[in-house]
A protein has these predicted regions:
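Flexible glycine/acidic-rich beta-alpha junction loops that bind and position SAM and/or redox cofactors
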Residues: 13, 71-78, 144-150, 227, ...
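A structural preference for short, hydrophobic beta-strand core positions in alpha/beta folds
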Residues: 38-40, 140, 300, 368, ...
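Structural recognition of alpha->loop->beta junctions
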Residues: 149-168, 316-324, 386-401
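Radical SAM [4Fe-4S] cluster-binding motif and immediate context
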Residues: 194-365, 372, 387
């Protein structure tokens, strides 16, 4: 039996990827002397299987059962039982929603935990642990906690980065502390308390995670960002000294080596807000990797203006093993770029994209993200961007575009992470003239441009996506599909060598919903329950 049991889902719909945040919290919990079990893949977890896990893991010593909201559906607390298709700017949320809707055609998907959370029909899940131990606490956390703060049968909701707050709560529940907590816990949203040091931290997995060699795990090298883009609502932006949140090289090396020796892991999502925020950081990582007996491949967020200012970073990233990267380009309208804190001229950014593609080659996927509806952006300037994206030599393999994400000021914003734009949108003529839930998202503006509303921006984004479809390269061997223990998909290098036609035939022949369910059961839930039940005999 365990002091803490935590549930999470896959970051990408129906692919065998672990929800990193819960494993990070679990590592911190164990480092503070508590036992913790993480349960992944909640979207393949029916209530019957959930009961088996709770029966085998909850006992008198259990202090809390927690549920991460990060990869759940977006929903409005004000509309119980209903959920949104998309929050502006969050394309993963849209994919989750569409995928889960299709899944409800399958009997095994109608009653899984993620669907039940989204429909506010999760009472039996939340109530069941207390039938075994009435004293334990039911706790929510994660990036969408504010979308689920209305749920009944929840004792506490933790907002923000939770390493320190989780330990504070556990110390209270275990009797180590007399601190009093309200239902909503947010006293250290940025995990700045001096009771821990991120630089000394590591995320460790256990035999109860049943990790397989083909899986892609997540790595944090640093935390936070020294930039402060106007649209960004991440909690640790604008940090002056990023080295205060950069892991020590020995910690990174040990984490990579342990994952390789125990699980055979060589693929990673590096989730730093800006992986290339300094050349020194990349040089440190090169030294770490040269000291390891294996190479890694990884996906990361990068800034193109930093590659332009420090071109040596292009070669450093290649040596490190970059395989996929995402650039938040936002716009090629130079006046718009300056407004949001990305003022480098578009011509220089484009030149750097060409240089990166030349050095990295076609086996590295470059994705660019764009926002529609920024100040000064017009339909004509956006058309210039689309025409460039359609050029045969465009260095971007994939381009995604979404309406500008601004949230109307309201009382609930105290729980909702907000950006500079969210707090100052009137400065550029944005307004929210409509009431109700939909009105919280549907901005309008009259600034002399001809993109004047969220609805119009969404229509332009949809039309652009369709127009660019035949110009985009389809990912082959991406880190999501190659995390399956599938005879063809698991070998990323082989799928990269396939022709586009052969790869299309392969992926079109696979029911990924069924594959996800079958593999998580065969390779995870069945052996996990066997091991848990064996421990209790």
């Amino acid at each position: 039996m365990f002091n803490v049991i935590l549930f999470t889902d896959a970051p990408y719909p129906h692919h065998k990827i672990r929800g990193y945040g819960v494993h990070r919290i679990a590592s911190q919990i164990r480092a503070n002397g508590y036992t913790c079990l993480v349960i992944d893949f909640s979207s393949a977890l029916t209530f019957d299987k959930y009961k088996e896990i709770i029966d085998a893991s909850v006992g008198p010593e259990t202090l809390m059962v927690g549920y991460s909201t990060t990869w759940l559906r977006y929903r409005w607390p004000e509309l119980p039982g209903e959920f949104t298709n998309q929050i502006p700017g969050h394309h993963i949320g849209e994919q989750h929603e569409l995928s889960h809707t299709k899944d409800e055609q399958h009997d095994w998907r109608k009653d899984n935990m993620v669907v039940k959370f989204g429909k506010n029909e999760v009472e039996e899940f939340l109530q069941y642990p207390k039938t075994i131990n009435p004293k334990l606490k039911i706790v929510l956390g994660g990036a969408k906690a504010d979308f689920y703060m209305d749920l009944q049968n929840v004792d506490h909701v933790i907002f923000g980065i939770a390493e320190t707050m989780t330990i504070d709560l556990l110390d209270k529940l275990s009797g180590k502390s007399k601190r009093i907590f309200n239902k909503f816990i947010d006293h250290d949203r940025k995990a700045h308390a001096d009771t821990w040091d991120f630089r000394e931290s590591s995320t460790r997995y256990t035999e109860l995670d049943f990790i397989q060699p083909q899986e892609t795990l997540t790595l944090e090298v640093g935390r936070g960002c020294r930039f402060k883009c106007a649209f960004c609502n991440f909690p640790l932006i604008g940090q002056k000294n990023v080295n205060d949140y950069l892991k020590y090289p020995s910690k990174i090396r040990d984490e990579l080596l342990e994952n390789y020796e125990r699980w055979g892991t060589t693929k990673y999502f590096i989730v730093d807000d800006t992986f290339n925020d300094s050349t020194e950081k990349l040089e440190m990582m090169v030294k770490v990797m040269r000291d390891l007996p294996f190479k890694i491949k990884f996906w990361c967020y990068t800034r193109i203006d930093l590659l332009a200012a420090h071109p040596e970073q292009i070669e450093l990233l290649k040596e490190l093993g970059v395989a996929e990267t995402f650039f938040g380009l936002e716009t090629f309208n130079d006046q718009s770029s300056k407004t949001i804190g990305k003022g480098m001229p578009s011509s220089r950014r484009k030149d750097t994209l060409y240089r990166a593609k030349e050095v990295w080659g076609d086996r590295v996927w470059i994705e660019g993200g764009f926002m529609i509806g920024l100040p000064y952006e017009t339909q004509a300037s956006w058309r210039n961007t689309v025409d460039w994206l359609k050029q045969a030599d465009c260095p971007l393999d994939i381009s995604t575009c979404y309406p500008v994400n601004i949230v109307k000021k309201s009382e609930r914003n105290q729980w909702f992470p907000t950006s500079w734009f969210d707090n100052n949108y009137e400065t550029f003529g944005y307004e929210f003239p409509h009431d109700g839930i939909e009105g919280m998202l549907a901005w309008e503006k009259n600034d002399g441009t001809d993109i004047n509303s969220f609805i119009q921006a969404q229509e332009i984004a949809d039309a652009t996506t369709k127009e660019l479809a035949s110009y985009q390269r389809q990912r082959r061997g991406d880190f999501y599909t190659s995390s399956f223990n599938h005879p063809l998909l698991f070998d990323r290098e082989k799928t990269l060598d396939m022709s586009q036609t052969d790869y299309n035939k392969l992926v079109n022949s696979i029911d990924f919903n069924q594959l996800f369910f079958d593999h998580t059961n065969r390779d995870y839930f069945i052996p996990l329950l066997k091991l848990l039940k064996g421990r209790n005999v």
